[in-house]
Amino acid sequence: MSCMGAAVNIITTDGPAGRAGFTASAVCSVTDTPPTLLVCLNRGASVWPVFNENRTLCVNTLSAGQEPLSNLFGGKTPMEHRFAAARWQTGVTGCPQLEEALVSFDCRISQVVSVGTHDILFCAIEAIHRHATPYGLVWFDRSYHALMRPAC
């Protein structure tokens, strides 16, 4: 699977179960009518109960240069330290939106399908926020790669 290039995303939530976030590349568009993304989340992950209870999330697609933030959210760093490392605003669902993200998709989880060790979260997009002309970031062959042209 390391040969499948993918955008690098930080998935965030906030709500009754608390605030949490993790790095994910298993994210993709499902349909534009209604606008829906999918996010894959391991049920054994420490953040799974928080996302499962809150039922909202924000997909923050990272720009080139945000590799350290991706690494922070991809490790065992305490949540308060993860969120302290960047600037956030609150989306319409109440989820944290990364101010410098390439794009942020504010979503409600509309359906969950379990496959193997993971839940596939189908996410109905409620709002989209784009940042002005950043460069994209992808994960390919177990390393980061910056896109050479503006992604949007």
UniProtKB/Swiss-Prot annotation:
Keywords recorded for this protein, A-Z: Flavoprotein, FMN, NAD, Oxidoreductase
Catalytic activity from the UniProt record: FMNH2 + NAD(+) = FMN + NADH + 2 H(+)
Gene Ontology terms describing biological process: nitrogen utilization; uracil catabolic process
Signal peptide: none
Keyword Membrane: no
Alphabetical list of SMART domains matching this protein: Flavin_Reduct
EC number in record: 1.5.1.42
MF GO annotations: FMN binding; FMN reductase (NADH) activity; FMN reductase [NAD(P)H] activity; riboflavin reductase (NADPH) activity
Domain of life of the native organism: Bacteria
InterPro entries: Flavin_Rdtase-like_dom, NADH-dep_flavin_reductase, RutF, Split_barrel_FMN-bd
Induction of the gene: Up-regulated by the nitrogen regulatory protein C (NtrC also called GlnG) and repressed by RutR.
PANTHER family: FLAVIN REDUCTASE, FMN REDUCTASE (NADH) RUTF
UniProt similarity note: Belongs to the non-flavoprotein flavin reductase family. RutF subfamily.
Reported function: Catalyzes the reduction of FMN to FMNH2 which is used to reduce pyrimidine by RutA via the Rut pathway.
Name of the protein in its database record: FMN reductase (NADH) RutF
Organism: Shigella dysenteriae serotype 1 (strain Sd197)
